[in-house]
Structures are given as C-alpha cells and as structure tokens.
C-alpha cells in the first residue's frame, strides 16, 4: 500500500524521497491491486474521466460516483441545463446540525440523461443543493453540485446517492 507523505506525492521505492504525481495518471495503478469489486469509488471532477469510469466498471467491477464540473464542459452543461430546467420536488432531503451550522441537503436524481450523455456507464445523473446557515453569524449560503454515478435505479435510490456524495468528503 502506498502512503503519500503529502498530497500530490508518492514515495519512491526503497527511498525517503518523494516524486510528484498526476492524479489522473496514478489513479488506475494505485487501485490495480486493491479488491474494489462491488465498492463505490468517489472522485472529484479531476478524475471524472471516461477511461477511468470504463476501467472501474469493466475491469474492477466497481461503481463510480463522480463530481462533474467545467473540466468536462459538455457533460457539465448538459447536466446543469437539465436540472436547472427540472421543476420538481427534491427526491430526498437531509438536515444536519453539526460544526456550528445547520445544513440542509437536497438531491434530485434522474435516469433521463443516461443515453444522452456522452459518458460510459451512467446509471443516474444528479444535482445536490446545500443550504447552509452559520448558527453564530446567521450567514446563509447556497451551493450546488452536479454529478454522475454508475449505480442504476435497482442499485441506488436518492438517499443512497446523497450518502455516497457526502461520504466522499469524509476523507478530506
């Protein structure tokens, strides 16, 4: 197992030196010898790559849960356009009272884009809206996040997808 000394570096074998890495190039070699079959691999927008998604599903029999941002412009534009023009109630909502704030998370999921999106193995596209109130200052903030997962409706509902999304941040 590799244990980086700091983000963006890997130890050089048989040495205390470190070498710089590129997350996109190192993700597959890092996961190659790890049994992730049936597991969900979450990744931020940098790793939202077609080759990585295909490798996870076909070679490792794992699921992906990817954040979609502007580095995948066409994908991002399609998902944001769909949800920004999707006037329905959220599919699931949670409220947490931790870390000095009140945080409401709402998720909308859809399979309507699965065949349209130019991305392999999409089971759902989703949008998460976070409404955050700082209890001390009263300051309010609203954030939106968009993404895709390989989990199909038989494998995940809105609550599960929201849990996967939130779970991604437990490491950072």
Model-derived features with residue positions:
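Conserved, well-structured functional cores that handle cations and Mg-NTP chemistry
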Residues: 1-52, 60
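Phosphate-centric recognition/catalysis
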Residues: 172
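Alpha-helix boundary/capping residues
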Residues: 34, 165-168
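An anionic, glycine-rich sequence signature occurring as long contiguous blocks
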Residues: 63-166
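Residue-level signal for helical boundary/lining positions with a hydrophobic bias
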Residues: 40, 168-169
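Gly/Ala-rich phosphate-binding loop of Rossmann-like dinucleotide-binding domains
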Residues: 57
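A short acidic (Asp/Glu
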Residues: 51-54, 76-78
């Amino acid at each position: 197992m590799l244990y980086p000394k700091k983000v963006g570096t890997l130890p050089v074998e048989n040495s205390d030196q470190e070498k710089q890495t590129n997350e996109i190039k190192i993700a597959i070699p890092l996961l190659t010898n790890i049994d992730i079959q049936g597991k969900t691999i979450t990744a931020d927008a940098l790793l939202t790559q077609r080759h990585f998604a295909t490798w996870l599903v076909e070679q490792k029999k794992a699921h992906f849960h990817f954040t979609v941002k502007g580095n995948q412009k066409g994908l991002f534009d399609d998902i944001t356009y769909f949800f920004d023009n999707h006037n329905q109630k959220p599919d699931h909502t949670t409220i947490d009272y931790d870390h000095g704030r009140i945080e409401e998370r709402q998720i909308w999921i859809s399979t309507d884009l699965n065949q349209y999106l130019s991305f392999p193995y999409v089971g759902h596209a989703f949008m998460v809206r976070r409404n955050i109130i700082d209890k001390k200052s009263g300051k309010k903030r609203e954030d939106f996040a968009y993404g895709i997962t390989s989990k199909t409706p038989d494998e995940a509902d809105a609550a599960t997808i929201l849990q996967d999304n939130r779970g991604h941040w437990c490491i950072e």
